């Protein structure tokens, strides 16, 4: 993950994925708060990357540091529910594809939003009192060393890279 001044969220994010992954890569792009201290105490692989006004460049640097078979990308202000860990592990173990799409939930009180879904009672802790969420399907897991790279200075995606793979 790439971070800058994420001390408010980083610990919660790391706690949500520690039991799910074998390696955590944190790339700091210039934090001036306690972000790096939090990362260090969590035994992550921490790297500095000078900010270049390019989110894709920072993400691609993080990919270059990963050594495991699969890469899960997540932002510091996001979490993965522990109840979903077994499902994700099974998807990875049984996948015949190099990519896995997960549902990302954007929690909101605005029930008029397009695609709004009421919070499932199994996820009330994650919803933090919000009325529900809007879902986005996004590639969040992919095999390492297959040439996938992020593209886009802002709102970076794997789309161009995935198209090249066919």
PLM ranges: what are they?
Residues 25-28, 47:
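Conserved beta-strand positions in the Rossmann-like core of class I SAM-dependent methyltransferases
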Residues 36-61, 65:
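Conserved donor nucleotide-binding strand/loop of the catalytic core
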Residues 56-63, 69, 74, 80-166:
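Catalytic-site signature of metal-activated, phosphate-bearing donor transferases
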Residues 1-23:
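Short, well-formed alpha-helical segments that are part of the catalytic scaffolds
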Residues 16, 20, 28-40, 51, ...:
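A conserved acidic beta->alpha catalytic loop
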Residues 4, 8-12, 30, 72, ...:
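Alpha-helical solenoid scaffolds in eukaryotic macromolecular assemblies
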């Amino acid at each position: 993950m790439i971070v800058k001044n994420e001390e408010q969220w980083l610990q919660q994010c790391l706690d949500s994925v520690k039991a799910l992954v074998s390696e955590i890569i944190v790339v700091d792009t210039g934090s001036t708060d306690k972000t790096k201290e939090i990362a260090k105490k969590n035994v992550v692989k921490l790297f500095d990357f000078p900010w270049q006004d390019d989110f894709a460049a920072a993400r691609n640097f993080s990919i270059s540091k990963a050594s495991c078979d699969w890469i899960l990308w997540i932002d510091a202000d996001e979490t993965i529910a522990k109840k979903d860990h077994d499902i994700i592990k099974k998807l990875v173990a049984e996948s015949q594809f190099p990519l896995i799409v997960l549902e990302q939930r954007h929690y909101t009180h605005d029930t008029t939003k397009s695609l709004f879904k009421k919070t499932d009672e199994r996820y009330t802790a994650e919803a933090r009192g919000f009325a529900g969420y809007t879902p986005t399907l996004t590639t969040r897991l992919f095999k390492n060393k297959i040439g996938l790279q992020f593209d886009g200075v802002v709102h970076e995606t794997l789309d161009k890279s995935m198209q090249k793979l066919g």
